[in-house]
């Protein structure tokens, strides 16, 4: 590593130059050099230099590209909060559970990485992580979908939504009579809480007497584009939503999104807490699940979902948007 060049870049607060410097060290696989550069930038920040961004970028590239031991060394609670995603998720996107298990001792990080790797196909022993942090098993159930996961790159990240079936226009019936919600509407809103807590989005959720279309009408539109979907497709959409921070909030990660989606199922089925047997939640496949949108230019981050319980004659709908 060229320490003289690094000194010049830091003292001149050349942010673009420091990012290119990190990229060069990654190309040469000089992990020790990246760690030194990160530490020197942190020291310079204490002297008033505005080089915290390149320091965070160095940590990001270590989590993304370095061997597992180097990646694990930069992890910590809250790390990556202001980046494209939490550093534990960045590291877990590139390193297997076998590589990471013995290197991560902080219970929160261990649980999140274990769940992320289980979602990505690794076998994770539930007894190897704290079950109180993510209160669902790190084992995909037969009724669950293949969840869309974040794809981290040197220059950014993609959050694929997965395949969505086409939507068709329908005229909506009269709005259903709104009734007091006993939990599901709050669980649906929890999927998107960072969109208004930390960002500039908004969301509405209702419970009504009637079917899914009556619930959608209660949100506001007279017409909507809709499609009926399977439980798996609805779970994938909810987990994708719950993992995000919206346009400007902090990303929570797919394990959080999956757990929040399970909680929606539990509340819809009348549970006050998560059932001991995960297979009990498969009963939610008997509900009618509808993805919809109001047909205008939604853009940004959006979730439009309706759920109908035909046996009890009630339905729920959520409309959430956070414009990028």
In which residue ranges do the predicted regions lie?
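Generic detector of well-ordered alpha-helical segments enriched in charged/polar residues
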Residues: 7, 19-23, 35-38, 42, ...
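Extended, low-hydrophobicity segments enriched in charged/polar residues
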Residues: 56-256
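Extended aliphatic helical segments
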Residues: 19-22, 26, 45, 51, ...
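Charged, amphipathic alpha-helical stretches
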Residues: 1-65
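Short, low-complexity intrinsically disordered segments
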Residues: 29, 50, 86, 95, ...
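C-terminal, beta-strand-rich globular interaction domains
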Residues: 217-324
């Amino acid at each position: 590593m060229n320490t003289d060049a690094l000194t010049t870049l830091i003292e001149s607060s050349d942010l673009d130059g420091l990012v290119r410097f990190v990229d060069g060290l990654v190309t040469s696989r000089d992990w020790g050099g990246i760690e030194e550069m990160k530490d020197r930038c942190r020291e310079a920040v204490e002297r008033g230099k505005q080089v915290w961004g390149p320091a965070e970028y160095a940590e990001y590239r270590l989590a993304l590209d370095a061997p597992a031991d180097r990646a694990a060394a930069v992890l910590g609670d809250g790390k990556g909060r202001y980046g494209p995603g939490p550093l534990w998720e960045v590291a877990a996107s590139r390193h297997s559970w076998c590589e990471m298990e013995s290197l991560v001792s902080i219970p929160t990080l261990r649980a999140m990485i274990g769940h992320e790797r289980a979602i990505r196909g690794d076998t994770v022993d539930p007894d190897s992580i704290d079950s109180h942090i993510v209160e669902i098993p790190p084992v995909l159930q037969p009724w669950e979908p293949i969840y869309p996961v974040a794809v981290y790159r040197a220059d950014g990240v993609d959050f694929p939504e997965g395949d969505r079936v086409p939507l068709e226009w329908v005229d909506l019936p009269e709005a259903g009579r709104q009734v007091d919600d006993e939990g599901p509407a709050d669980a649906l809103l929890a999927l998107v809480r960072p969109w208004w807590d930390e960002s500039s989005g908004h969301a509405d959720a209702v419970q009504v007497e009637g079917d899914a279309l009556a619930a959608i009408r209660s949100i506001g539109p007279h017409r909507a584009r809709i499609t009926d979907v399977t439980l798996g497709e609805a779970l994938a959409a909810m987990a994708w939503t719950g993992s995000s921070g919206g346009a400007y909030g902090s990303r929570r990660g797919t394990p959080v999104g999956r757990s929040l989606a399970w909680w929606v199922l539990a509340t819809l089925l009348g549970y006050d807490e998560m059932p001991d047997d995960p297979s009990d939640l498969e009963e939610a496949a008997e509900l009618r699940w509808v993805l919809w949108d109001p047909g205008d230019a939604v853009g940004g981050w959006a979730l439009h979902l309706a759920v109908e319980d035909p046996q009890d004659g009630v339905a729920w709908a959520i409309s959430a948007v956070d414009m990028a």
